[in-house]
Curated annotation (Swiss-Prot):
Enzyme class (EC, first level): lyase
Keywords, sorted A to Z: Amino-acid biosynthesis, Aromatic amino acid biosynthesis, Lyase, Pyridoxal phosphate, Tryptophan biosynthesis
Required co-factors: pyridoxal 5'-phosphate
GO molecular function: tryptophan synthase activity
Organism of this sequence: Pseudomonas savastanoi pv. phaseolicola
Taxon lineage: Bacteria, Pseudomonadati, Pseudomonadota, Gammaproteobacteria, Pseudomonadales
EC number annotated for this UniProt entry: 4.2.1.20
This protein's GO CC annotations: cytoplasm
Protein name as catalogued: Tryptophan synthase beta chain
Subunit structure: Tetramer of two alpha and two beta chains.
Length: 409
């Protein structure tokens, strides 16, 4: 890891090393180029920054706390663990940070309709929320499989006025929802703004979503200085597409003393075909407008991911994560469904916080590591979302485990 400036990407072509870029249909190219121009202009406009700051503070509820997880720290008997409390945001996750930024950009561009894809439903809820706030019609593409396991969020989106389009192609999950959203965008290029929910897609989306999420890491830096007088020693976040992780990581990338760990969904184990760990079990390829690591078979076809967590159930990862993996600035590991469920329960019992199953993957890795670290090691875990949406999934798994136990007895 000889490079010292890890925050300079992407280049003018949207590349982070060999990853990223703009792999889109000819009809979309003028649109993404226009979006890039508008975003660059918005970044340079103090009025845009002022409006962003207003909504982040008074609508989203930022800054959210950096919380010392005292009982979890005692339980692990090692590192001092802090939670960055993104689940306290309006709508219950980090997704709203990005949605506020993109809806303000859509408004600036004069777009009259929003579309989005969603997996766990949190990005769908956040998009429906900002659509309601700004009086824009909104269509959410969601895989039929995810609709089944995220009924509460589907109802929330409908309450907020969104139209939900079930996607039955493929496995009916996030990848398929994104495919359908891209088709909609091609058809309705003039009036529609595609509000992508993660650090993927064609340039400028990976950089734009990262920039809107970087408030997570910026606040963490300031809050840790206030609380401990120094930088944290390690950062841990779950990674699907990777927006909460990139939001936490990016402001720290050039701080060599800070160890950074991204946690992928290991499903039933990365040695099986039932996981969603693109970096630990995938190879480079092109999907959804960018080159990144993807789960593929021997013929280069995208394979079906698996995770107990709908938000991590994606066969790719943001291109900047792929770059950071290759240059070894960030370590990417995987956590299985069972490990995530164990951490989910521990967090509930020890801290009185019900985390999202996505977040539970990061918590599981944090607990593994904390036990072997000194008590002056400062660790920050991104609590990316709350677990209300996952109650049915957890109930089903607990019921299945009880049945298995009964059979054994």
């Amino acid at each position: 890891m000889t490079q010292t400036n890890f925050r300079s990407g992407p280049d003018v072509n949207g590349l982070f090393g060999s990853f990223g870029g703009r792999y889109v249909a000819e009809t979309l190219m003028p649109l993404v180029l226009d979006l890039n121009r508008e975003y660059e202009a918005a970044k340079a406009d103090p009025e845009f920054a002022k409006e962003m700051a207003y909504f982040q503070r008074d609508y989203v509820g930022r800054p959210n706390p950096l919380y010392f997880a005292e009982r979890l720290t005692e339980f692990c008997d090692g590192a001092k663990i802090y939670f960055k409390r993104e689940e306290l945001n309006h709508t219950g996750a980090h997704k709203i940070n990005n949605c506020i930024g993109q809806v303000l950009l859509a408004k600036r561009m004069g777009k009259k309709r929003l579309i989005a894809e969603t997996g766990a439903g949190m990005h769908g809820v956040a998009t429906a929320t900002v659509a309601a706030r700004f009086g824009l019609p909104c269509v959410i593409y969601m895989g039929a499989t995810d609709i089944e396991r995220q009924q509460a969020n589907v109802f929330r989106m409908k309450l907020l006025g969104a139209e939900i389009v079930p996607v039955t192609s493929g496995t009916g999950t996030l990848k398929d929802a994104m495919n359908e959203a891209l088709r909609d965008w091609v058809t309705n290029v003039d009036d529609t703004f595609y509000l992508i929910g993660t650090v993927a897609g064609p340039h400028p989306y990976p950089a734009m979503v990262r920039d809107f999420q970087a408030i997570i890491g910026k606040e963490t830096k300031e809050q840790m200085q206030e609380k401990e007088g120094r930088l944290p020693d390690s950062l841990i976040a779950c990674v699907g597409g990777g927006s909460n992780a990139m939001g936490l990581f990016h402001p720290f990338l050039d701080d060599a003393s800070v160890e950074i760990i991204g946690v992928e969904a290991g499903g039933h184990g990365v040695d099986t075909d039932k996981h969603a760990a693109s970096l630990n079990g995938g190879v480079p390829g092109v999907l959804h407008g960018n080159r990144t690591y993807l789960l593929q078979d021997g013929d280069g076809q995208i394979t079906d991911p698996h995770s107990i967590s709908a938000g991590l159930d994606y066969p790719g990862i943001g291109p900047e994560h792929a770059f950071l993996h290759e240059v070894k600035r960030v370590e990417y590991v995987s956590i299985t469904d069972d490990e995530a469920l164990d951490a989910f329960h521990q967090c509930c019992l020890l801290e009185g916080i019900i985390p999202a199953l996505e977040t539970a993957h990061a918590l599981a890795e944090a607990m593994k590591r904390a036990t072997n670290l000194r008590d002056d090691h400062l660790m920050v875990v991104c609590l990316s979302g709350r677990g209300d949406k996952d109650m049915q999934t957890v109930m089903n798994h607990m019921a299945a485990a009880e049945k298995t136990q009964e059979k054994l007895v």
